[in-house]
Amino acid sequence: MKEIKGLARVKFLPGKLEEWKRLTEQAMEIVRTKDKGTLQYEIFFNADESEAIVFERYRDSDAALEHFANIGHLMAPLMETATITGELLGDPNEQIRRNLTGDQPKLFTPWIALSDEQPAAK
């Protein structure tokens, strides 16, 4: 399983939702035009837009690193708009593992799966 998945949980600071939306629209444009290995990049809101989930899928560790390099300049401004926690899912390469300091994001490695790579029996 080479794919890397990310799940970010976002709780907006008071009055910062519109700024976060503006910044994530910039991020989405970068993903669309510069990222080569991003397979999925979706944002979901709860009913009152006080929280969001960002779901990301990358072809492999190199694609995830490319994405982080492309949007890195947006991370500090985004962190000023919300409390963000997250999970990284997959078996990332050593470069990504070295960058995982502290407790965020939390890394979860594969155990068992039903996916396109390992479909159910017919």
Give the positions of each predicted feature:
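Short S/T/G/P-rich N-terminal loop/turn motif that feeds into the first structured element of a domain
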Residues: 1-52, 59-70, 79-122
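A short hydrophobic/aromatic micro-motif that marks alpha-helical segments and, especially, helix-coil
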Residues: 74-76
